[in-house]
């Protein structure tokens, strides 16, 4: 949403897709248009572009993994810059202590990326590729051209390699102040929950609220925001939406993008959370 994207295809396993649809509906409450598709078998991240070919059409596309959490002041600006790129791909690197568990970017002495290796035994850097990707329309044909890896999957790393070899890959590093949490394990999910709890307790506001982002992007009206607040009642989430609607939350102007943020007391901005 912070990238300015309003049409979203949610791809999930056959038993999970109906649950997602019941939870999120058509997305109109967020000013979005949501569609749904099934991945019959877990045959790799790159398969998403084949499944979503009709949805993508002639457009460029972004993909984010559903079990990844990103947080940081300036995130929206980073995403919008990536979305503006034409005839290129953008991925994001993040410093980790266990690069063996991720796709890893190798850099030359000048900091230029020279290779990407999936879960290397002997990683040449500590920068992992996060679960957030922006591609031009060529990604669909690139995905179709892939052959399954040894583990029987169409690897997203192989798509990134194609863009890298063609000189069409940008790698943006998420530095200090950004948090990336991959919640693919029980322990990691607990870490993410505790992180969110801590940040929300310290700040006194929600780490992310789709209705809030939609309102600041001018995708939904104040009346729609108040209706959502009423839906959640006296819960902390409902009260947060009410505070947004009543203008009680100030926003910093660190990452102004000029794509429709509502001014608050002469300060233009948005909530830099995804």
Annotate each predicted stretch with a short phrase:
Residues 219-220, 225-265:
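Short, amphipathic C-terminal "tail helix"
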Residues 105-107:
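A structural signal for short hydrophobic beta-strand segments in well-ordered beta-sheet cores
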Residues 62, 83, 112-212, 223-224, ...:
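Catalytic-core segments of class I nucleotidyltransferases/pyrophosphorylases
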Residues 1-65, 69-77, 84, 227, ...:
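Conserved N-terminal catalytic core of the sugar/cofactor nucleotidyltransferase
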Residues 20-24, 143, 192, 241:
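Hydrophobic packing residues within well-ordered alpha-helices of enzyme cores
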Residues 72-100:
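Conserved donor-nucleotide/metal-binding helix-loop-beta segment in metal-dependent transferases, i.e.
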């Amino acid at each position: 949403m912070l990238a300015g994207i309003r049409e979203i295809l949610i791809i999930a396993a056959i038993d999970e897709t109906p649950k997602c649809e019941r939870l999120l509906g058509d997305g109109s409450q967020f000013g979005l248009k949501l569609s749904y598709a099934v991945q019959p078998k877990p045959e790799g991240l790159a398969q998403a572009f084949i499944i979503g070919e009709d949805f993508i059409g002639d457009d460029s596309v972004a993909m984010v993994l559903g079990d990844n959490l990103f947080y940081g002041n300036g995130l929206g600006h980073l995403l919008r810059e990536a979305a503006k790129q034409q005839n290129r791909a953008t991925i994001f690197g993040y410093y980790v202590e266990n690069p063996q568990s991720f796709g890893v970017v190798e850099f030359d002495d000048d900091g230029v990326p020279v290779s990407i290796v999936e879960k290397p035994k002997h990683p040449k850097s500590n920068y992992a590729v996060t679960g957030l990707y922006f591609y031009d329309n060529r990604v669909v044909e690139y995905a179709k051209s892939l052959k399954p890896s040894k583990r029987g999957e169409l690897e997203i790393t192989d798509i990134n390699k194609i863009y890298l070899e063609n000189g069409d890959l940008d790698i943006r590093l998420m530095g200090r102040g950004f948090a990336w949490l991959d919640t693919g394990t029980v322990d990691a999910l607990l870490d993410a929950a505790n992180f969110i709890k801590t940040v929300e307790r310290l700040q006194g506001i929600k780490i992310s609220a789709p209705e809030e982002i939609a309102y600041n992007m001018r995708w939904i009206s104040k009346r729609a925001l108040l209706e959502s607040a009423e839906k959640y009642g006296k819960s902390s989430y409902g009260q947060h939406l009410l505070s947004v609607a009543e203008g009680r939350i100030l926003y910093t102007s660190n990452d102004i993008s000029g794509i429709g943020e509502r001014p608050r007391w002469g300060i233009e901005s948005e909530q830099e959370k995804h």
